[in-house]
Amino acid sequence: MYRVLRLLPLPLSVAISLSALADEKPPNWGLCPATLPLQGFEQAPGMDKHVVQSRPQLPTNIEGDTLTGTARTPLYQGNVLMARGDQLLGADSVRMDTETDSYVAEGHVRYQDSSILVVADRAEGNQDTDVHKISNIQYQLIGRRGNGVAKSVDIHGQVGQTHEATYTTCDPSQAIWRLRAPEIDVDNVEGFGVARHAVFEVGQWPVLYLPWFKFPIDSRRQTGLLYPQLGYSGRNGFDYAQPIYLNLAPNYDATLYPRYMQKRGFMIDTEFRYLYDDGKWQTRAAFIPNDQLRDKDRGRFSFNGYHNIDNHWQARASLAWVSDTRYMEDFSSRLVGMSSLSSLQSTVGVYGTGETWTAGLMADRWQLTDYSLNESALAYNRQPRLFFNWDKPVLDFLEFGLYSEVVRFKHDDAYLVALQNDGNYLRTGEVIRYYGGTRLDVKPYVSLPFTGASWYVTPTFGWRYSSYYLDSGIAEQLNGSRTPVRSLPIVSLDSGVYLDRDTTVFGRNYLNTLEPRFYYLYVPYRNQSDLPLFDTRAFTFSWGQLFRDSRYTGPDRQNDANQLTLAVTSRWLDQNTGKEDLALSVGQILYFKDSLVTLSDSEERIQKGKSVWVSDVAYNVNDRWTLNATYQWNPNFRRDDLASVRARYLIGSDGIINLAYRYRRNTLDGTTQLKQTDFSFLYPINPRWSAIGRYYYSLLDKKPLEIIGGLQWDSCCLAVRTVLRRHMRDRTGNMDNSIQLEFVFKGLSSVGQDTDRVLRRAILGYYRDDLYLVPPSNTTTDPDAYDPNKIP
């Protein structure tokens, strides 16, 4: 039994290493899946990580048509095949020297394992000294599109050198781009390669010369230059950033982002990441000295991280700061902790969770980032907030629970601003003083969930107790006590029935359900005019509002109620596929008495009678067409308060068309609050070309909010996107124009501005998988910023 020839692992790591430069965006191989232009072994096994890991312990089998020579120098000829695990080596002839451990393999030398396929003319070397030479190599990565050639490979142990090597993810017969290097050194011990005098070619044209560059060949990170980011916008002019990655240690690194903006000057942006067993954190800071457009120094800072204290407790922090209220608009920063365009939230706290409880101690602070507003637009700072929630099922029909928190509220004074003749906003000198206070809110409850095979009845008895200790200033504004108290019971009864039947519609078999639901709520009236409004507003009326025990988001108001919700949902489920083709829901609240509690005097009281009708429709016409609609009809004023219609059509495997109409009425004065249309698409013109666009228009303001138009050319190894964008950049309606051009060399990297974030936000379904992410609201706003463990 002879040792297996070590022809592959080191030299072909060059090929794998080049593909390791791949961008982190999801590659799209849909137009031309990975093919194997080189002939492989028919008996090659599939990818099995257990076989790969056990290679050194497996025996090597050698066979051929003939065996001649001597015991010292056996010669295998004719269809020679050496096999070990997933590794196969074939040649026309293999001569070995058992004393010196040398070998020569000639004629149609082929090597294949679960990750790569290699064809060469000749291989020779010495197993004892671990010196090898392979001539005229062609290689193909299996499962990825990487392929290329090399004139020769010299191996000395774990160090190797290739000569006249190429790499591309295109088909070998139609290589649109290719990376070529006359010399590449590879060090498997250190995990990096060095290419000298490398040339990046597009077609037959060299477009980039790199006299020397270093790159990783495995998952270990290496210090070096990342690919540049280029762009142009009306705000900044020509925009160039050159990221520099610093691999400082296995568990922490840094990235520098020197950036030049034609209209503003130079900016330095830095990011530092730290990872350890019990947590991780990252920080980012930017500074631009003497911004030429604002004539002042500007900057930002952010920090985000967590530390696992034990199995139940975790410390988390999310901090963000900008130097001025125009920073967000000018630099479109994606700060950690960014919650809106008008403000930034910083949060720090300790949070715990158990089988039946959650608890935490946290504090936050808000910073104004919109120059057209004053601090009155900010939420109250919670400094601190202590909360404890408990939910314990005792029996199948008995459940106890508790919601509780104590919060100290603070707020910055508001410095009023006014629009000047030159279009700038300046402070007027007027100041609105803000005062705070401390609030304790406790809500214990007991629930009795009775259920049957097709019904449920759940009575719930709760009590809400809220007490305050207010600053004297806010108590005087409310003409009340500094220590107001509110205490009241909350009683609800939630019940429903599930009915179904078999039915046939247009020859298709369906399971049709009828799901009526009844929700009764009783809360007695308590005068709450002496209570402040720290963190409480009215919920937007929707389907979910039909079944809440309060129509307000916070504890500062608890509405009185004597009401009954009547609602029903009906579904049509295809019995062959199990898919829900149609769902209809409609509901309304019956008010048995006037509701006297309001947020303020301007809020209209709910009168005895009927609420707005709420209806939702979801219709999956087929696998391509989807229709959704929400409609609210106010029977008291005989008007529609809200309407939303959304249609989606899927084209092929990648294309999509979205149509939407949104209308909302201001329920306080009956005026139209929002009226918009939204049309977006990714339309495949042919297998290579596709058009992209969005037209987002305000019918109320009679102006577009965002216009996007572009073309993209997509092949198996290259994508080119050109995007023209005009969008509203601030609350005052100022527009900005930009041109974005991106070249995506699939399996390598991209050059230009990152168009993905803009297109994924503007065109829901630009990446088809985004349609199925949860929650969709996070996806449509900013997919890359979605945090499933967001700090409460």
From Swiss-Prot:
Signal sequence region: 1-22
Record-linked InterPro entries: LipoPS_assembly_LptD (IPR020889), LptD (IPR050218), LptD_C (IPR007543)
Keywords on record: Cell outer membrane, Membrane, Signal
Annotated GO CC locations: cell outer membrane; transporter complex
Name of the protein: LPS-assembly protein LptD
Described function: Together with LptE, is involved in the assembly of lipopolysaccharide (LPS) at the surface of the outer membrane.
Stored SUPFAM superfamilies: Porins (SSF56935)
